[in-house]
């Protein structure tokens, strides 16, 4: 039995819509209001700079990962397979698209079982928090085991679902399900938003529920309410939420430093300088997604390799010019904030009680 045509068409449309950045970018990521400190007396060899990280039992080449995007359609599966191979060569982690459809179409599991292409890197499976409630802890855990991944991402995407005509409406029980799943798993649990951010209070709660890592996935990147609004030709509603959400910058600047080793940041990180700023703010890893999708569909695998080569050089340059040999040094007060961001941050902290 093949996958229903409407499901395949929806996934294909997601890719098509996300290729046009200007149509689906939501809000401001506030990264432009952060400046990295300049040190004119960096007294060491550029080759001494080390941007490698050890995480999930692997040594990765830089503190960047490819965030989950799509899967299920032929286009999405081919895209994922290519990206996993690229990520393995580059030695960076990668997340796969949601495996929700495998509960209805288990015969397609090989399209999601890509560890055979990812021997050198952490590979993440991905499913919605609502699906844990829907299918139960044991089925989710068994699927994760079959997919042979190094960690599981549980995504929170209420905004997207509420905008979909046939999306989920009942989110009751997701907290309890996340907590129970964390107890049941033999791999780390990553909980992420999908472009609307996570408040400092919710970050603490997710860790208390058993999350190993939290990906802030803030506003300022792809806005999935706009994506669904475009897909259903209903921008009258979707456009009202064009600037909805919390930029990851605000949460990074508001949480305790002790939590940051387990914090990933994504949502509008597109350039090497964006990545450098996110790392300087303390994020363990920075996630990139749509910018990779666009590079791949514009110019193929070579463009993706070029993108990550630029990321590596810009991050190393930023570290050298701020007098940092290591990521640890780079995360040690190597930035300053504009007066505008300081004012906005003050309002944010007051509003969210941090």
UniProtKB/Swiss-Prot annotation:
Homooctamer. Dimer of tetramers. Substrate binds at residues 11-12, 98-100, 160. It is found in: Cytoplasm. It catalyses: isopentenyl diphosphate = dimethylallyl diphosphate. Mg(2+) binds at residue 161. GO terms for molecular function: FMN binding; isopentenyl-diphosphate delta-isomerase activity; magnesium ion binding; NADPH binding; oxidoreductase activity. Involved in the biosynthesis of isoprenoids. Catalyzes the 1,3-allylic rearrangement of the homoallylic substrate isopentenyl (IPP) to its allylic isomer, dimethylallyl diphosphate (DMAPP). It comes from Borreliella burgdorferi (strain ATCC 35210 / DSM 4680 / CIP 102532 / B31). The keyword Flavoprotein applies. Its EC number is 5.3.3.2. The keyword ATP-binding does not apply. Pfam families: FMN_dh. One of its GO terms (cellular component) is cytoplasm. Belongs to the IPP isomerase type 2 family. Its cofactor is FMN; NADPH; Mg(2+). SUPFAM superfamilies: FMN-linked oxidoreductases. It is an enzyme of class 5 (isomerase). One of its GO terms (biological process) is isoprenoid biosynthetic process. This is Isopentenyl-diphosphate delta-isomerase. Keywords: Cytoplasm, Flavoprotein, FMN, Isomerase, Isoprene biosynthesis, Magnesium, Metal-binding, NADP. FMN binds at residues 67-70, 98, 126, 192, 222, 289-290.
